[in-house]
From Swiss-Prot:
It is found in: Golgi apparatus membrane. It comes from Arabidopsis thaliana. Belongs to the nucleotide-sugar transporter family. UDP-galactose:UMP antiporter (TC 2.A.7.11) subfamily. One of its GO terms (cellular component) is Golgi membrane. The chain crosses the membrane at residues 20-40, 50-70, 112-132, 137-157, 164-184, 202-222, 245-265, 294-314. Sugar transporter involved in the transport of UDP-galactose form the cytoplasm into the Golgi apparatus. One of its GO terms (molecular function) is UDP-galactose transmembrane transporter activity. GO terms for biological process: UDP-galactose transmembrane transport. Coiled coil: none annotated. This is UDP-galactose/UDP-glucose transporter 2.
Length: 345
């Protein structure tokens, strides 16, 4: 028998709600958190011209830990071995570092083109993650492709320059995409193979293990000293960072809820669509002129979303294996499942 894990989001029970309500609640939390995050980043990075990504992420980590503590989470609630989260954090920091490093070789439009394709490698890699082995129907790949193409068209219509490609930059951003794809699927696999895993555990352990990974590049690049001096001259920046971290915390927990309930690929589609929504809102709020290319991009994004939402097969539940782990009776089945679990953790 398949046992459903009870899920909740900031005290709101999700397990006893229909799927559409679960989706709406989690997506709303994600959009709220990251729209606030975008406003704060715009202020800190563009208005104040601060570019201390490692340091700001480091500060954000401590805010996360405090908020998790307020949620009542303690180490007694951890059900997975810490080595699982070492892998997770190493991949996360590697992706972050490669993305930041690629900016030295790729201009903004080129990086956006590559990062917008994230949902495709997430779907492809899902078939190779131990404990997951997820397969998707053809129409979902088409949906993802339309969404990606539409977002690229919309973004490049607003670009002040053409994409500038460099082989080193392409290799770095490709590595970041592969790590991003592995990260989302690994998180889903952890939720799948151990349904007792909570979103708070995932965020707590990833943060605790990830903080030392952040400290090394901060010291080696000297960013920690430059950031400390700059923020000492503008101490109100810490207030902005704390507010941003609180909003992003809501977004992060919502994303983990989406991964646990709907899978990594669906979550990647939502995070990709969020970029399009953010861009569209900036045009509506600041009344920027929309060109024909903007319209084409929006049309493709809408087609991708609609194609994803429309059921294409009456046998939909059978096309993707159920996420919760099911123990197979018999020695061979147990051994196979144990091998899957070992290779994951």
């Amino acid at each position: 028998m398949k046992e459903e894990q009870t899920r909740s989001l900031f005290g709101i029970s999700l397990s006893d709600k229909p799927t559409w309500q679960q989706f709406l609640i989690c997506t709303s939390g994600f959009f709220f958190g990251y729209l606030v995050n975008g406003v704060c980043e715009e202020y800190v990075y563009n208005r104040l011209q601060f570019s201390f990504g490692w340091y700001f992420t480091f500060i954000q980590g401590f805010v996360y830990l405090f908020l998790i503590y307020l949620q009542g989470f303690t180490t007694k609630h951890i059900v997975n071995p810490m080595r699982t989260y070492v892998k997770l954090s190493a991949v996360l920091m590697g992706s972050h570092g490669l993305t930041k490093g690629s900016l030295a070789y790729l201009n903004y439009p080129a990086q956006i083109m590559f990062k917008s394709t994230k949902v495709l490698p997430v779907m492809i890699m899902g078939a190779f993650i131990p404990g997951l082995r997820r397969k998707y129907p053809v129409h979902e790949y088409i949906s993802a492709f339309l969404l990606v193409l539409g977002l690229i068209l919309f973004t490049l219509a607003d670009a002040q320059m053409s994409p500038n490609f460099s082989m080193i930059g392409i290799m770095m951003i490709t590595g970041a995409l592969i790590m991003d794809a592995f990260l989302g699927n690994l998180q889903e696999a952890i939720f799948t193979m151990n349904p007792e895993t909570t979103q708070m555990e995932m965020l707590f352990c990833s943060t605790v293990v990830g903080l030392p990974f952040l400290f090394v590049p901060m010291v080696l690049t000297g960013e920690v000293f430059r950031a400390w001096t700059a923020c000492a001259q503008h101490p109100y920046v810490y207030g902005v960072l704390v507010f941003e971290a609180m909003a992003t915390f809501i977004g992060q927990v919502s994303v983990l809820s989406l991964i646990a309930l709907f899978g990594a690929a669906t979550t990647a589609l939502i995070t990709t669509a969020r970029k399009g929504v953010t861009l569209l809102l900036s045009y509506l709020i600041f009344t920027k002129p929309l060109t024909e290319q903007h319209g084409s991009g929006l049309l493709l994004i809408a087609m991708g979303i609609v194609l994803k939402m429309v059921p294409m097969d009456s046998k939909a539940p059978a096309k993707i294996p159920a996420r919760p782990a099911v123990r197979i009776a018999g020695g061979d089945g147990d051994r196979e499942e144990d091998e899957e679990r070992k290779s994951l953790v």
